[in-house]
Amino acid sequence: VLLNHADIMTIHSFCLSVARENYNRLGIDPAFRVADETETLLIKAEILDRLFEEKYGSDEPEDFFYLVENYSDGTSDVKLRELVLKIFEFMRSYPNPEGWIEKQKLSYKDGEDYWFDMMKKYLLFYIEGAVELTKTTVETAEISGPETYLPMLYDDLEQLEDIYGSASFEEICLKIKNIKFSALSRKKCESETKEKVKYLRDRVKKIISSVNTKFLMRNTDEMKEDIKKAGFGICRLLDLVKEFSDMFDEEKKRRRIADYGDLEHYCLKALIDGSYDNPVKSQAAEELTSKYAYVMTDEYQDSNAVQELILSLVSGERNRFMVGDVKQSIYSFRLANPDIFAEKYNTYSLKKGAEKERIDTFLS
């Protein structure tokens, strides 16, 4: 009996319903229709043509020509057009697309500090792995031999652990480049674990070699220049994406249509008071929260960040159920984010009755 009163629908049907009920708050035409994928693709192509034509005919086309030269293949601007569309679709999978653009631009305005901090984390991640593997190697040699290898292994560990004490990215790079793996002792020894120890040490050496090849082929001054050049192009590319987005929105408004991405963002806007960083439930969200005893989501692995925030805004305390299998995520082309599912899978408890409970045998 209760099932007959349930709202069973796709996420976009739900978003459409919320948008229509809150059209006045959203400032949209209540008579808008949802465009199909073919119509949407044609409009995007039309807007891109118009935007690029304006840029080619601009009095100051230098920045645009820079993008064409650096993000196309030299024969046409097709690659740049494709890139604009990819970034546009990607940013719409976030609750605040414009905020996402500004965040990316700010990361380049901050220059090398932002990127060096990020690279520092990557380097220390690899070094942590090398340290743990070296500790295992040392323990193996201490217990089962060969003892003649221990001075070299202790030296390996000392060099690797010393990197943790480095304050700056530049210092970390220098210490990694200067790591020296002394030759193992050639003294004859009887040890069943001799080959295992050599194998483990070789794995450590490969980690360091990989770090040098992937991250440290250029010195820090060259990296700073690379970041500066990349920032120049990326910021102008993002400006171009923003222009396309604004023109696309205006054209859809003129035609009184919306696409599926619009439905998600209309719905989210109706459910939020305050900022996207610290969302507060709107009156509409509170009413929906009171309406639904349970909020159940199937194929949860195919959710994106916008959908996740929408569902959280209409859920109450301990009334949300999510079903999915991260291995079956097939909608990456629609910018689903399986990490949302994976994060909950890895943090929810298997303990029955836990506040956030994971049930692995749901289907059985």
Predicted regions and their residues:
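Acidic/histidine-rich catalytic neighborhood
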Residues: 346
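Coupling/switch/interface segments within P-loop NTPase motor domains and analogous charged loops
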Residues: 57-89, 96, 151-245
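Conserved ATP-dependent motor core of P-loop NTPases, especially the RecA-like helicase ATPase domain
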Residues: 1-167, 171, 258
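Oxyanion-binding/catalytic loops of NTP- or PPi-dependent enzymes
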Residues: 320, 349-350
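Conserved helicase NTPase motor core
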Residues: 7-11, 16, 32-41, 45, ...
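A short hydrophobic/aromatic micro-motif that marks alpha-helical segments and, especially, helix-coil
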Residues: 27, 161, 208-209, 274, ...
